[in-house]
């Protein structure tokens, strides 16, 4: 799939009930799935089990993917 944005671009989210109008920087592009990850736009909470690297575990916030058709390049 051809993409109009790349990693590091400034984008605005143009569709979506909770995220419309937000701006951020593209952290990653997945061309095969047609999604992008925008910094601070769609934060998800993920439960993490305790491991040796993270002995406390708990809830971690991560950035979720947004379909590439829902973002517009700014500037």
UniProtKB/Swiss-Prot annotation:
Domain of life: Bacteria
Signal peptide: none
Organism: Akkermansia muciniphila (strain ATCC BAA-835 / DSM 22959 / JCM 33894 / BCRC 81048 / CCUG 64013 / CIP 107961 / Muc)
Name recorded for this polypeptide: Large ribosomal subunit protein uL24
NCBIfam families: rplX_bact
Molecular function terms, GO-annotated: rRNA binding; structural constituent of ribosome
Family of this protein: Belongs to the universal ribosomal protein uL24 family.
Ribonucleoprotein among keywords: yes
């Amino acid at each position: 799939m051809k993409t109009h944005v790349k990693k590091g671009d400034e984008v605005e989210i143009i569709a979506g009930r909770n995220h419309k109008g937000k701006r951020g920087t593209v952290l990653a592009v997945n061309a095969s799935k047609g999604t992008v990850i925008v910094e601070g736009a769609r934060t998800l909470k993920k439960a993490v089990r305790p491991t040796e690297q993270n002995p406390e575990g708990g809830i971690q916030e991560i950035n979720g993917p947004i379909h590439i058709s829902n973002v517009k390049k700014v500037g």
